[in-house]
């Protein structure tokens, strides 16, 4: 059982990095601040530093604040991972801008409810997590809008060389977002794997073991270094035709929101925050040139992901019980 828990947690970490990396590097690639391979590798390096510098508060949230740990069996944790992983693979192949956080929360809820009923849910923690998931994209949109609006007005008389400076600042903002993303998203896999280890009696407390941190972070960064090229094209040009000012504004907005969530232990969707930040950055210049249909896709993902993974994990748990 431990081998299955480790394998699925690492796969989840890998697809998490694969799904979210386009959101981080798309602005710098589309504005020619960095080449694609260079951007992905630098982002992966920043992500590796994130949990080491900023901590793993999100892991504690995943392991102890959504469902009652004592209500979870090893099979239940396994079912939650299977559901989150299957949903991540499905949405990656279809291009739906979903969230691995939504998927994991839904998976944990479904497995806990199937195991012990409603009493297995920790309502305050659940409300906190869902609140962070819901409020973070609008915050990204608002900060992206305000950042670009302010920059455009301050730079009206600027020389054309301002674009070169903005490209350099974009690289710094990308690294900040990468580190924040590493502290926000990599601990999700660490938290669920730690929960699984506790359920099988492999450890007593919920502190993340060093080998769990290193392995989950390694697979997470590996997924990032490969990147999702289709998502990069969508975020880099299909939402709005980005220039350096938009890329910089969106990256700063994303870094602020994701860093805040990571420090507070709130698991959010970096890809949805960045898509919203790009929408806001574009809207600050030309409202009618923004492709607002991406909001429809995001709302669809919001509505579908938690219910779908909840039902899926409950179904997987029932199958595992029958196979036992």
Where does each model-flagged region fall?
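Multi-pass alpha-helical transmembrane bundle typical of ion/small-solute transporters
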Residues: 1-324
């Amino acid at each position: 059982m431990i081998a299955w828990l480790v394998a699925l947690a690492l796969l989840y970490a890998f697809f998490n990095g694969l799904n979210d990396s386009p959101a981080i590097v798309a602005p710098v690639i589309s504005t020619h601040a960095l080449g694609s391979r260079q951007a992905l590798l630098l982002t992966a390096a920043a992500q590796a530093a994130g949990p080491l510098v900023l901590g793993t508060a999100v892991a504690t949230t995943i392991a102890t604040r959504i469902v009652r740990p004592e209500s979870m069996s090893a099979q239940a944790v396994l079912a939650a991972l299977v559901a989150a992983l299957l949903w991540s693979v499905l949405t990656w192949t279809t291009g739906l801008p979903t969230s691995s956080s939504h998927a994991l929360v839904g998976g944990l809820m479904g497995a806990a409810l199937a195991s012990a009923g409603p009493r297995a849910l920790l309502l305050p923690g659940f409300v906190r997590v869902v609140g962070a998931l819901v409020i973070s994209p609008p915050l990204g949109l608002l900060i992206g809008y305000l950042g670009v609006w302010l920059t455009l007005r301050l730079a009206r008389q600027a020389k054309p060389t301002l674009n070169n400076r903005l490209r350099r600042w974009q690289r710094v903002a990308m690294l900040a977002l990468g580190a924040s993303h590493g502290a926000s998203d990599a601990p999700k896999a660490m938290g669920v794997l730690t929960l699984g280890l506790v359920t099988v009696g492999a450890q007593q407390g919920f502190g993340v073991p060093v080998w769990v941190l290193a392995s989950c972070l390694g697979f997470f960064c590996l997924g990032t270094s490969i990147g999702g090229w289709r998502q990069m094209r969508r975020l880099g040009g299909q939402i709005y035709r980005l220039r350096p000012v938009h890329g910089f504004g969106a990256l700063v907005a994303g870094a602020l929101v994701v860093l805040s969530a990571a420090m507070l232990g709130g698991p959010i969707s970096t890809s949805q925050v960045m898509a919203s930040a790009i929408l806001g950055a574009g809207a600050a210049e030309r409202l009618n040139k923004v492709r607002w249909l991406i909001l429809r896709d995001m709302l669809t993902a919001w509505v579908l992901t938690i219910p779908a993974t909840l039902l899926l994990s409950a179904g997987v748990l029932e199958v595992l019980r029958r196979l036992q």
